Amino acid sequence: MIYNESLPDNLPSLCSKALLADVPCDRLVRDLRPDFFYRPASLERMCTSGCAAALSSWTSSVRSACGKNVSVPTDFDLLASPVVIPATLEHTFEFTCLRENNKFCGPVAALAAVFTDPGVSPFNYLSEAPEGTTDPGRCDSCIAARLRMRAGSPYFDGPIVASESLYQRLTSSCGITGKPVTTTTIDYSISEPEPTEDSCDGTQYTIQNTDDCYSISKAQGVATAWLLADNGLAAYCADFPTSGSLCIANKCDTVTVGVNQTCIAIANSAGITVTQLKAWNQVINPVCSNIGMMNGTTLCISPPGPRLPLPGTTDIPPLVPTTAAPVPTDAAAGSNKPCSRWYNVEAGDYCNLVILKFAISLDDFLFLNPGINANCTNLYAKESYCVHPVGDINTYAGRPGHVSITIDPNATFTGIPFTMLPNATVKGYSRPYTPAPLAKGVREDCVHYFKGDDYQFPPDQLGYWKSNCELAARNYGADNDNFVAWNALGTNVTDPSCSFVPGGRYCGSWNSQVVRTITETEPATATTGDGGPTPPAPTHSGQPQDCDTWHVVSSGDSCQSVADDAGISRDQFHDWNPAVGRDCSTNFWLGQAYCVGVSEDMGDMSTVASSTTSSVTPGPSKPEPPGPTHTGQPSDCDEWDVVETGDTCGSLAESNDISLSQFFDWNPAVSRDCVANFWIGQAYCIGVSS
């Protein structure tokens, strides 16, 4: 199963021999993976009782031969008993060959995966459900058995499955009883890494009787979070020691956080940016929503850590000489320009050799020594030539950078003083139209915007999509979570109640993304008759006579992508195009027209619902909340505020002149620490009529 070169050299010979023993199993067993679905034929071939017995015997012999005092390195620098090697493979074999009701469970899980997430997967031999099969469902005995085995295993993702009680939740919801989890453990070695001596890069401080976490951080000039992190202490000063010493390493200029202070207020008062504040205090989360839990602690308002010393002076001469060298008595004729270095030519020298020796170009060498001809045939031995200019050679007379200016200090200035010049003016660009205002909470820096009026389709016209929000997100190719955040929707895009307010603009893409149109433009060649538009390209037989929407296949299309683009299901596509094989491998051709809508099912998809107006009789009424709300808010609430990025419970109460207690009384769903149910885009009550 394993090779000699893969084992450590320091293993005892008996242990190595046991590990290298032959195990009579199919060759597929050696490379088994727990995250792979194997075909039934492969399972029949390798899942034999003989192989199971051989693996069990191999594990037992390795445990006996290697003992408890031998270890091999594993992940995360842990040392484990060598028995982990055969035991891991034995577990993978048992998981792969798991059976329920005399059937392999792997193919059942593969079929369930196809129904849950259809498409080609590198871990799945199925790309779509075979015809005539049904979804096994999450309560299938095989699905439960596989989850039960994972929950009791110490290998792979077993500890995660156990910690999240996934199997217990499944058995509870599916009514499965009498099948508890059986837990196994890994044979880890008792040897542990040698502890490293703690070192402090700063100064040691001895804790006094009157000290606490907050007083030490203030007195020592260190942020509270840095003090805790540098000493391996619990967050929020929990279980802070009352004796011993502390390492004070990351000193900085500090400020104490006040009640209900915000990141913006702290940064402004310190003369720094919010970005700097978060960079120097990594305990602050990206949106500063946890600053309200830090009152009384100290934060850094300058870079933490030791200051680098200022650079000192150096005696190294400048790279470019700034003073001329004395002119030698044997200087060549014409070599009379300022020169920082001279070279006395020796017999056998020639121009190319000299310029290579002193890293100077031939043009510069001839410029500094004009007595040499263009062919460089009159370079004389025993004479000195200039091989380096003083400063930049381009500032010499006759070079491109040379400027000669003569200034008369007694001349009278005749121009217009700079202070008397008129201020520059810029004429703004006039837009040919006035864009609609941004809807409440929508980002102001998006690349593409759209009007809420464009997505007011009734449910029967949405087709595949669950809401107008999901339709817009798909048209702009946006991730669901990002789309919700850009537009402060307050609910998932797949929620049928998710919608846009007419008259406002919404963010379609924050970065450059390809915008897909809502409806396809009909080809110019299509004509309308009694049976619907004439197909714009050749068609197959069997397509419905009342088809009124067509799609011509282009490069990159698939049955699924055509159905998705048209807002129909895959089954509808195949029902309306029966010539196409269910796996899309036959009769799906480039340039061919396929039916994606019929008159009795689709309706007029090109019609965009226009905003309607209705008259309302004036009368006393309370204001409608400007965003989604929580339960428990008072019925007589007449003032609302929608949470934006950077808001806290304290800042919301302060900006609306109410107390924090009033805020929590009127919004009982929000936890008192402002952690639970305080959401961006949600409306909260900040005033009542009574």
From Swiss-Prot:
Q: List all Low complexity biased stretches.
A: 606-619
Identify the glycosylated residues. 4, 69, 260, 295, 375, 410, 423, 492
Other noteworthy facts: In plants, chitin acts as a microbe-associated molecular pattern (MAMP) that is recognized by lysin motif (LysM)-containing plant cell surface-localized pattern recognition receptors (PRRs) that activate a plethora of downstream immune responses.
Q: Which PANTHER family match?
A: AM15, PEPTIDOGLYCAN-BINDING LYSIN DOMAIN
Q: Where is this region: Disordered?
A: 523-546, 606-636
The role this protein plays is: Might have a role in sequestration of chitin oligosaccharides (breakdown products of fungal cell walls that are released during invasion and act as triggers of host immunity) to dampen host defense. Does not play an important role during host colonization.
Xref: Pfam families: LysM (PF01476)
Supply the alphabetized keyword list. Chitin-binding, Glycoprotein, Repeat, Virulence
Per the record, the domain comment is: The LysM (lysin motif) domains are small globular domains involved in binding chitin in eukaryotes. Vd5LysM contains 5 LysM domains.
Query: Which InterPro entries did the record assign?
Result: LysM1-like (IPR052210), LysM_dom (IPR018392), LysM_dom_sf (IPR036779)
Q: What happens when the gene is disrupted?
A: Does not affect virulence on Arabidopsis, N.benthamiana and tomato.
Q: What is this protein called?
A: Secreted LysM effector Vd5LysM
What positions does the domain LysM occupy? 203-248, 253-301, 341-387, 549-596, 639-686
Name the protein family.
Belongs to the secreted LysM effector family.
A GO molecular-function term, please? chitin binding
The record ties this protein, via PROSITE patterns, to: LYSM
Species whose genome carries this gene: Verticillium dahliae (strain VdLs.17 / ATCC MYA-4575 / FGSC 10137) (Verticillium wilt)
What domain of life is recorded for the organism?
A: Eukaryota
